[in-house]
Regions:
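Soluble N-terminal domains of membrane-associated systems
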Residues: 1-102
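Core alpha-helical transmembrane segments of integral membrane proteins
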Residues: 119-121
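N-terminal loops that bind phosphate or other acidic moieties
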Residues: 100-109, 113
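A short structural micro-motif
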Residues: 44-47, 113-117
């Protein structure tokens, strides 16, 4: 019989992953390079008290794990564009989180707005 370690996600962990993954997705789909996306995701995690997070980003996939006892998240990137405005706004939200100027929930709402906006062609 195999016994699996079943991690239970708290609301804060789920919200942290939601914010981190959405920020990563916006950045990568907007043309940011993978190492910059990983750096931003890691910085947000550290800001939220998760110093042992792991992220791995390629041109088509984002993988993220908050800590060893949490479920990993993976997202496949299907579209890419160049949108420096979206990158700048997403980085601004990351900075505001680091400074404590915005709550996790507000950051998620602002990131959702950025994500839902159409790219300017």
């Amino acid at each position: 019989m195999t016994i699996y370690n079943q991690a239970i996600e708290s609301y804060n962990e789920k919200m942290a992953k939601d914010v981190i993954m959405l920020a990563g997705r916006i950045l990568l789909e907007s043309g940011a390079e993978g190492s910059r996306v990983e750096d931003t995701m890691t910085r947000i995690a550290i800001t939220l008290g998760h110093k042992e997070s792991n992220s791995f980003v390629t041109n088509t996939v984002i993988n993220f794990m908050l800590h060893d006892e949490s479920y990993p998240r993976m997202y496949r990137i299907r579209t890419r564009d160049t949108n420096l405005h979206r990158i700048s706004r997403t980085n601004g939200i990351s900075r505001r989180l680091a400074l404590g100027d915005i709550s996790l929930e507000d950051a998620f709402q602002e990131l959702q707005k950025i994500y839902q906006e159409q790219s300017i062609k």
